Amino acid sequence: MAINLNEYSLLIKDQIKKYANKIISDQKGYIITIGDGIVRVSGLDDVLLNELVEFENGAYGIALNLEPNSVGVVMLSDYYDLKEGSSVKRTGKVIQAPVGDGLLGRVIDPIGLPIDGKGELKNISGYAPIERLAYGVMQRKSVHQPLETGILAIDSMLPIGKGQRELIIGDRQTGKTTIALDTIINQKGKNVNCIYVAIGQKNSSVAQITRLLEETGAMAYTTIVSATASELAALSYIAPFAGVTIGEEWMRQGKDVLIVYDDLSKHAVAYRALSLLLRRPPGREAYPGDIFYLHSRLLERAGKLSDELGAGSITALPIIETQAGDISAYIPTNVISITDGQLFTTTSLFNSGQRPAIHVGLSVSRVGSAAQLKSIKQVSGSLKLELAQYRELDTFSQFSSDLDAETKIVLEHGARVMEMFKQPQAKPIDQTSEAVLLFGIKNRFIKWIPTDHIIKFKEFILDKIKQDQVYKKIEEKKAFDDEIEKELTAFFKDVVKKYTSTLVDYNGSLYGDLKELE
């Protein structure tokens, strides 16, 4: 058989073209010590800070400490079958989180694995590194749009704007999480994507929150990132960063995002545990020296982007738990100085039945007033001052039984206003209805109602106002003019008469001159 040299040469040339001379370099190391979720590794001389490393059993860790002779790695998954001498290799990647609309309605862990039993994540647009620089000053815009919480006390006196960072701070069991969840529930139909980051909570608490959001229909636009108390400290450490990375993708698309960190006290404790185990030098309260930077680099990623960048926003509601009301402790003062205001909840208000238990005197919103709706701003200007006077006189009235008429008026009005601010969980009020209620407070129409009937009277107003034409006018104009004020005055006189007519043994002359209602 004759050998066709041309065919052979063509085959050889074809093989040469297909041949790719790739050199794959793999840097491997080995475990020196292991324990408490921390692994010391030798041999990874070129590893990067925050780089993912892979162990021989398929587990992953993050290189957090780069030392001359070893690397301190924090574990992200089970490490019980690893031992001294086991091999470990670099991945060349930093830790990433999934992003995209496929995350809405899902519960995931900080490394992006679904934990809600609904199968794999779908419609994911990609993965993004969880550590990223915040946008600069020139890439931002000042806060100017309101973020409606649906909570009357907040929207009237402590308004929050889109792109603001408002701290919710208070002792345990004072309704901090409830305020955050009510704000999420109120975003229904407002084109705001929500992220709830659970840090160091019980599995049962996360399940309860998921159920509440599903029952209220809020889960359709919400993602839950959960790092529970039973998991490794490293997952609690990365959870908020994973959450804000998910939000940043939506913000870049020009969308509005609300993110809740519940809570950053446990986040700081998790970071302290990791730092001490990595033998980093402890500082005040045994926290490491960069604890302030930990929270500042997280919260600075929230904000309102400029029009050139799509005008998207991330509004952050970090939660901090205090011990015995001490807001001057290390972590609380750190986060207060980073954020744009705080809502302070107290045990005494909560136990007295004032819920949400917001202490208006110690709470502040530094940038929210620029974003407040005009109709609400017109009728809520004097509220904070009135309540401050009420609290002061209420304290003194406990020592004196003989009060003058003017003091009695301030005390009675203050007590009624506090009743108006009581609100049950998952029952948000729309901003037009809030403006109407505040109009009634400002013009003292609530003085005709006995204090123990204020809550029922409030429900009566909310029921009647939506059937009235003036509601649509306020909704359209988003401000009060002379015509609307005239119509609202007539509306309130009418509802006061109708409501008081249902009360047994009611004597209107005890509350003022009845001619005012004519």
UniProtKB/Swiss-Prot annotation:
- InterPro entries, A to Z: ATP_synth_asu-like_sf, ATP_synth_asu_C, ATP_synth_asu_C_sf, ATP_synth_F1_a_nt-bd_dom, ATP_synth_F1_asu, ATPase_a/bsu_AS, ATPase_F1/V1/A1_a/bsu_N, ATPase_F1/V1/A1_a/bsu_N_sf
Q: What is its main location?
A: membrane
**Residues involved in ATP binding:** 170-177
Which function does this protein serve?
A: Produces ATP from ADP in the presence of a proton gradient across the membrane. The alpha chain is a regulatory subunit.
- Can the keyword Magnesium be found in this entry's annotation? no
Superkingdom to which the source organism belongs: Bacteria
- At what residues does the UniProt record annotate the site feature described as Required for activity? 363
Tell me where in or outside the cell this protein is found.
Cell membrane
**What HAMAP family would the database entry show?**
ATP_synth_alpha_bact (MF_01346)
Origin organism is Mycoplasmoides gallisepticum (strain R(low / passage 15 / clone 2))
Q: Which reaction does it catalyse?
A: ATP + H2O + 4 H(+)(in) = ADP + phosphate + 5 H(+)(out)
Enzyme Commission number(s) from the entry: 7.1.2.2
Q: Which UniProt keywords apply?
A: ATP synthesis, ATP-binding, Cell membrane, CF(1), Hydrogen ion transport, Ion transport, Membrane, Nucleotide-binding, Translocase, Transport
Gene encoding it?
atpA
Query: What is the protein's name according to its record?
Result: ATP synthase subunit alpha
Q: Give the family this protein belongs to, as stated in its UniProt record.
A: Belongs to the ATPase alpha/beta chains family.
Q: Which PANTHER family match?
A: ATP SYNTHASE SUBUNIT ALPHA, MITOCHONDRIAL
GO CC terms in record: plasma membrane; proton-transporting ATP synthase complex
